[in-house]
Design a protein with these regions (language model features):
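Arg/Lys-rich, glycine/proline-spaced intrinsically disordered segments
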Residues: 6-11
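Amphipathic alpha-helical segments used for helix-helix packing
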Residues: 103-131, 171-176
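Amphipathic alpha-helical segments that line or abut small-molecule/effector binding pockets
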Residues: 25, 89-105, 109, 113-117, ...
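Amphipathic alpha-helical linker/stalk segments
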Residues: 67-96, 103, 141-143
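Hydrophobic/aromatic-rich alpha-helical bundle segments in the mid-to-C-terminal region
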Residues: 131, 146-195, 204-222, 230
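Helix-turn-helix
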Residues: 22, 26-64, 68
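Hydrophobic/aromatic residues within well-ordered alpha-helical segments
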Residues: 62, 69, 73, 92, ...
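Amphipathic alpha-helical packing segments from all-alpha helical-bundle domains
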Residues: 90, 110, 123-149, 156, ...
Length: 230
């Protein structure tokens, strides 16, 4: 009966959002597993359970899709306080911890390695990664530092310095294929980086000494407990 006919209207905003996430999740997984060169748009469409036409309606080519994957991954990046932080060091410490935890996820690590290995053949990947870093890391930190009292004409350079400090240990381990830092190591490095940036080397050194003192005290307590059990 005509009165019972169900019409298919345009997909809702929520439907579109879910489908987009489905496409980008599938694409990130495929790029991470197989590399940029090997993945085809048809494979992504099949993996995401959408038509090739739907995929091409959203992304003109594979590079556009890869670029969208980078932005999609960056949506998990932490945010800094909107207003001027009362404690700049604490805000930057928390941000440093959160950003490294995101970058240390399996998919982020594999995408980073993909860019490193395939950028010689596809230099556009490197440019896309740099643009993504500027948009989702450098620009937000720059804006935060300006609100925290840094001069407008130098805030971006200071933002880059802070990020270099905060990400240095993660970058070193990635470069030399070493185990990624543990949660405790991430927290310690983030605290030292923020202290160095805000207060200089003396503050960072004091934090390092405090960490070492804590390790020694923990070791002494462990030995005392072990002896007591004998």
């Amino acid at each position: 009966m005509a009165g019972n006919t169900i019409r298919k209207g345009r997909p809702s905003a929520e439907d579109s959002r879910v489908k987009l996430a489905q496409i980008l999740d599938a694409a990130r997984d495929l790029f991470s597993e197989r590399g940029y060169r090997a993945v085809t748009m048809r494979e992504v469409a099949e993996q995401a359970n959408v038509s090739t036409r739907t995929l091409y309606n959203r992304y003109a080519d594979k590079f556009s899709l890869f670029n969208a994957c980078l932005s999609f991954g960056a949506s998990a990046f932490p945010t800094l306080p909107v207003a001027n932080a009362n404690d700049l060091e604490t805000a930057l410490t928390n941000f440093g911890i959160a950003i490294v935890k995101v970058l240390a996820t399996d998919s982020s690590v594999r995408l980073s390695m993909l860019i490193y290995w395939e950028s010689a053949e596809f230099p556009e990947l490197l440019r896309a990664s740099e643009d993504n870093q500027r948009k989702h890391l450098v620009d937000p930190v720059t804006a935060f530092l300006k609100k925290s009292g840094f001069p407008s004409d130098t805030a971006e350079e200071f933002a880059k310095l802070y990020l270099a400090l905060a990400l240095s240990e993660w970058q070193r381990r990635m470069t030399y294929n070493q185990p990624l830092p543990t949660q405790k190591e991430i927290e310690q490095h983030a605290a030292r980086a923020a202290a160095m940036f805000v207060n200089g080397a003396d503050a960072a050194l004091a934090k390092s000494r405090s960490d070492k003192k804590g390790k020694v005290e923990s070791l002494v307590a462990h030995r005392r407990t072990s002896r007591a059990k004998i």
